[in-house]
């Protein structure tokens, strides 16, 4: 991964109270530090090797000029007056993932199959975790 974004949304907030962007050149890459207020928070994590990233907190999207491996997690945390410490968060792959469901019988001698995508997605809505910015197949 070359980039990590961490966005903190306190419960009910429409804009993040904190945005952290780390690159792999940063000494603390992969170990972001947040100071969270008491209450419930949605903390969104996005890690990617994508190029030409643009973050838009109004539309809750992160788009790329070229998408490569990308991982994501919507992490909910409840902070009390006595909460502190670190959390380990495991991100889920969300880009360059393919799930093929084949309902037809596969011939015994079949060794490969071809897939032709109808659209490429160049972004993620980090609140829903869904892809955005679809364009025609390349």
For every predicted segment, state its role.
Residues 2-56, 109-138:
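Tryptophan-paired
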Residues 8, 85-87, 104-105, 117:
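Functionally constrained cores in energy, signaling, and assembly domains
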Residues 33-35, 76-78, 88-90, 101, ...:
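Generic structural detector for well-ordered beta-strands
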Residues 23-28, 50-88:
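Structured interaction patches on ligand/partner-binding surfaces of diverse proteins
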Residues 91-106:
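A short, Gly/Thr-enriched small/hydrophobic beta-strand-prone motif that recurs across taxa
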Residues 64-65, 108-110:
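Short, low-complexity, polar/charged sequence segments that are solvent-exposed and flexible
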